[in-house]
Swiss-Prot record:
Cytoplasmic side: 547-562
Native organism: Influenza A virus (strain A/Japan/305/1957 H2N2)
Glycan-carrying positions: 25-26, 38, 179-180, 300, 494
Any further remark recorded for this protein: Major glycoprotein, comprises over 80% of the envelope proteins present in virus particle.
Impact upon substituting residue 561 to A: Loss of palmitoylation
Keywords linked to the UniProt accession: Clathrin- and caveolin-independent endocytosis of virus by host, Clathrin-mediated endocytosis of virus by host, Disulfide bond, Fusion of virus membrane with host endosomal membrane, Fusion of virus membrane with host membrane, Glycoprotein, Hemagglutinin, Host cell membrane, Host membrane, Host-virus interaction, Lipoprotein, Membrane, Palmitate, Signal, Transmembrane, Transmembrane helix, Viral attachment to host cell, Viral envelope protein, Viral penetration into host cytoplasm, Virion, Virus endocytosis by host, Virus entry into host cell
Subunit structure: Homotrimer of disulfide-linked HA1-HA2.
S-S bonds: 19-477, 57-288, 70-82, 105-149, 292-316, 484-488
Ranges that cross the membrane: 526-546
Protein name: Hemagglutinin
Compartments it resides in: Virion membrane; Host apical cell membrane
Length: 562
């Protein structure tokens, strides 16, 4: 009877409640932190772009220079198969095949070719300027050509160069100069012919022991032809060696030769500089536009990182080798479990989130005689939202020193340098990737701790208002010692709770409940003593009965000695 009375009493005195909690939803988004892996959160943002469209596009409305079957050398020298490239508009980047067919039609080499390609990564337009017209070489033949560069079966030559040979039986010293008054630097290319034997040397130049001299304010280069027997390429045993230089504004370049000079007819004024590059690709230009191009395809994204390809041109995210970079923006997603009550362990004592609270990250659940309901705490939610909104920008700012993997090419004699360069670039990218991943892990840890702290702060804010007018239930909830209607609940939520107004009522109810607890302790003590005595007596009677039965059937002998 006493137990029933206590149950009814405690049911009757259960007061109104208000609980502090946080948002939960059906999200399956997972993030990693320094300490945990695959933490489910309510909201997250993937900051790694993994896709491309597989197309080569215009970059910011400007098409690339599509070389087709021509190489960089074939374009600049003027291979007859590259006539469509004799005049090209501004380009955004250059598309070159891996092994273009039309390069040096007359076999030979191009000195510092890789450096020339690197120069093109900062050039967006050349203006072709005639610097040494053919008709200025009045004492030499300027119609030299070769079947290696044939057009329609007839011998021809590089369109931008002039092959000077003897006029009749004489090859006087050839001299030419050009003063760069264009207002920009100018790319100038020239060449030296290396015959197969002395007979060819005399046939073309009359002189033996010739030289080619080129000079500027910063360049002094003198070359002599190397006569040697070589295997034929494109039907030619001779070779042509091309060189280049950048002629500064107001500087002059001077040519002097007694034979074997391949003179430039045109130079290339660098009329526009900017971020460009050479895309090694077998693809063709498609009808599309982008702000970021890779050899694999265009990237159209606002994300700060990508893992598509290390070589990019345009306004591109930063390249990392990572497979996953996800930033937590929401809270740990721990939906409410009915059997465990309303809460779970986000702030150390709250056991689960509320899917019913959809208009904020943190808030309240109340219950009183007028009903129950959820309400978000707009102030703390807004502050948290403002703090996290700039998280992606913060990550970008911390990673603002982009390591740029530039596509470099190396000659056959520089393979060891190429391997070293590749290792260095791979090392830089590894470090860059590690930094990005570590930064994301740290930011995720901070975000989850930040949310945890905000819930705890909201709980403390309510606790400081209510003080001893409530009882802390230990699960994020407070039970009032006084009646708290909806107006009272709203005052708690907006921070205007009137503690003195309810102080006296709370004090009376608190003392009454304490009295019930004290009286109930006496009842429990009597019940405990009664249960102990009754249990001992029952055990003694049972033992006596067993002993009597065993004595009666002879299983137990009893001797009484006097």
């Amino acid at each position: 009877m006493a137990i029933i009375y206590l149950i009814l009493l405690f049911t009757a005195v259960r007061g109104d409640q208000i609980c502090i909690g946080y948002h939960a939803n059906n999200s399956t988004e997972k993030v990693d932190t320094n300490l945990e892996r695959n933490v489910t959160v309510t909201h997250a943002k993937d900051i790694l772009e993994k896709t491309h469209n597989g197309k080569l596009c215009k970059l910011n409305g400007i098409p690339p220079l599509e070389l087709g079957d021509c190489s960089i050398a074939g374009w600049l020298l003027g291979n007859p198969e590259c006539d469509r490239l004799l005049s090209v508009p501004e380009w955004s980047y250059i598309m070159e095949k891996e092994n273009p067919r039309d390069g040096l039609c007359y076999p030979g080499s191009f000195n510092d070719y890789e450096e020339l390609k690197h120069l093109l990564s900062s050039v967006k337009h050349f203006e072709k300027v005639k610097i040494l017209p053919k008709d200025r070489w009045t004492q030499h033949t300027t119609t030299g050509g070769s079947r290696a560069c044939a057009v329609s079966g007839n011998p021809s030559f590089f369109r931008n160069m002039v092959w000077l040979t003897k006029e009749g039986s004489d090859y006087p010293v050839a001299k030419g100069s050009y003063n760069n008054t264009s207002g920009e630097q100018m790319l100038i290319i020239w060449g030296v012919h290396h015959p197969i034997d002395e007979t060819e040397q005399r046939t073309l130049y009359q002189n033996v022991g010739t030289y080619v001299s080129v000079g500027t304010s910063t360049l002094n280069k003198r070359s002599t032809p190397e006569i040697a027997t070589r295997p034929k390429v494109n039907g030619q045993g001779g070779r042509m060696e091309f060189s280049w230089t950048l002629l500064d504004m107001w500087d002059t370049i001077n040519f002097e030769s007694t034979g074997n000079l391949i003179a430039p007819e045109y130079g290339f004024k660098i009329s526009k500089r900017g971020s460009s590059g050479i895309m090694k690709t077998e693809g063709t230009l498609e009808n599309c536009e982008t702000k970021c191009q890779t050899p694999l395809g265009a990237i159209n994204t606002t994300l700060p990182f990508h893992n598509v390809h290390p070589l990019t041109i345009g306004e591109c995210p930063k390249y990392v080798k990572s497979e996953k970079l996800v930033l937590a923006t929401g809270l740990r997603n721990v939906p409410q479990i009915e059997s465990r009550g309303l809460f779970g362990a986000i702030a150390g004592f709250i056991e689960g989130g509320w899917q019913g609270m959809v208009d904020g990250w943190y808030g309240y659940h109340h219950s009183n005689d007028q009903g129950s309901g959820y309400a978000a705490d707009k102030e703390s939610t807004q502050k948290a939202f403002d703090g996290i909104t700039n998280k992606v920008n913060s990550v970008i700012e911390k990673m603002n020193t982009q390591f740029e993997a530039v596509g470099k090419e190396f000659g056959n004699l520089e393979r060891r340098l190429e391997n070293l360069n590749k290792r260095m670039e791979d090392g830089f990218l590894d470090v860059w990737t590690y930094n990005a991943e570590l930064l994301v892990l740290m930011e995720n840890e901070r975000t989850l701790d930040f949310h945890d702290s905000n819930v705890k702060n909201l709980y403390d804010k309510v606790r400081m208002q209510l003080r001893d007018n409530v009882k802390e239930l230990g699960n994020g909830c407070f039970e009032f010692y006084h009646k708290c209607d909806d107006e009272c609940m709203n005052s708690v939520k907006n921070g205007t709770y009137d503690y003195p107004k309810y102080e006296e009522e709370s004090k009376l109810n608190r003392n009454e409940i304490k009295g019930v607890k004290l009286s109930s302790m006496g009842v429990y003590q009597i019940l405990a003593i009664y249960a102990t005595v009754a249990g001992s007596l029952s055990l003694a009677i049972m033992m006596a009965g067993i002993s009597f039965w065993m004595c009666s059937n002879g299983s137990l002998q009893c001797r009484i000695c006097i």
